[in-house]
Amino acid sequence: MAVDITLLFRASVKTVKTRNKALGVAVGGGADGSRDELFRRSPRPKGDFSSRAREVISHIGKLRDFLLEHRKEYINAYSHTMSDYGRMTDTERDQIDQDAQIFIRTCSEAIHQLRTEAHKEIHSQQVKEHRTAVLDFVDDYLKRVCKLYSEQRAIRVKRVVDKKRLSKLEPEPHTKRKDSTSEKAPQNASQDSEGKPAAEELPEKPLAESQPELGTWGDGKGEDELSPEEIQMFEQENQRLIGEMNSLFDEVRQIEGKVVEISRLQEIFTEKVLQQETEIDSIHQLVVGATENIKEGNEDIREAIKNNAGFRVWILFFLVMCSFSLLFLDWYDS
């Protein structure tokens, strides 16, 4: 005879709900809540490799954003003509260069350390391939940021060279001539002011006394005029200065080309260094694998030597027993 235990089941469910409420456990209000309770899983633990890789990518992204944010101020060689707001000095640019190089070197060392630790840890082949792909992506991201920095630095150096070239080509201001003219003007004004009262007080001054003054003025005018020898000397000096400026201009152009070439070679050198670092890591892994293979080969050789020694003992034992058997049979037959 079947027994109806529906009331007992409802009482049990009510007891479980009351206990869960007392313990502070969330209870689903229906099918969805029960499904959430059944299929709820603990969060997947994140490994140290993922967090460190994200940290390196975040640092590289910050460096890229910083370079792009200060790109205009960094490559502007004429910042002294701007206002104080947004102006960047050469010392700040040098500090940016130094910090960027240290930052790139630190990120490269961090990638190398992550690659070494990833190869040392024991994981499945799929995990190893995944980590290798992640490190290759981070390495490529760092190379692109290095290329951006190298281009900015090359542009800055080129503009600095252009600025120096233009500053050398500017004519020198004739300050001495202006000073001499400015000094002569007050003297002439003072002489005129003193000459007028004298002329008014002595209107009947003889003409002979005024002739020396005219003679001195005429002599001064003659001194201002240049002789043909002086004109020729100044022309030769101008030709010499023009030749020097042309030679300086050619030297500046050569230096500019060399600086651009050095920047390009530096970019290639950075890429080659990163490639060599990857090749060194692969060679290290091959050396480690070869060492393990050599150890396994030595163990196999030792085991083979032991097996050969035991085999020789059994052969000797068999030969000795055969010899004794033949001697026994010969004795027994006789």
UniProtKB/Swiss-Prot annotation:
The chain crosses the membrane at residues 309-329. Its main location: endoplasmic reticulum. It holds the Pfam family Syntaxin-18_N. One of its GO terms (cellular component) is endoplasmic reticulum membrane. Keywords: Coiled coil, Endoplasmic reticulum, ER-Golgi transport, Golgi apparatus, Membrane, Protein transport, Transmembrane, Transmembrane helix, Transport. One of its GO terms (molecular function) is SNAP receptor activity. Residues 33-50, 166-182, 193-207 have a biased composition (Basic and acidic residues). GO terms for biological process: endoplasmic reticulum membrane organization; intracellular protein transport; positive regulation of ER to Golgi vesicle-mediated transport; positive regulation of organelle assembly; regulation of Golgi organization; vesicle-mediated transport. Residues 330-334 are lumenal. The keyword Protein transport applies. Residues 242-304 form the t-SNARE coiled-coil homology domain. Residues 183-192 have a biased composition (Polar residues). The keyword Kinase does not apply. It is found in: Endoplasmic reticulum membrane; Golgi apparatus membrane. Residues 29-50, 166-225 are annotated as: Disordered. SUPFAM superfamilies: SNARE fusion complex. It is a single-pass type IV membrane protein. Residues 1-308 are cytoplasmic. Syntaxin that may be involved in targeting and fusion of Golgi-derived retrograde transport vesicles with the ER. Belongs to the syntaxin family. Component of a SNARE complex consisting of STX18, USE1L, BNIP1/SEC20L, and SEC22B. RINT1/TIP20L and ZW10 are associated with the complex through interaction with BNIP1/SEC20L. Interacts directly with USE1L and BNIP1/SEC20L. This is Syntaxin-18. The gene is Stx18.
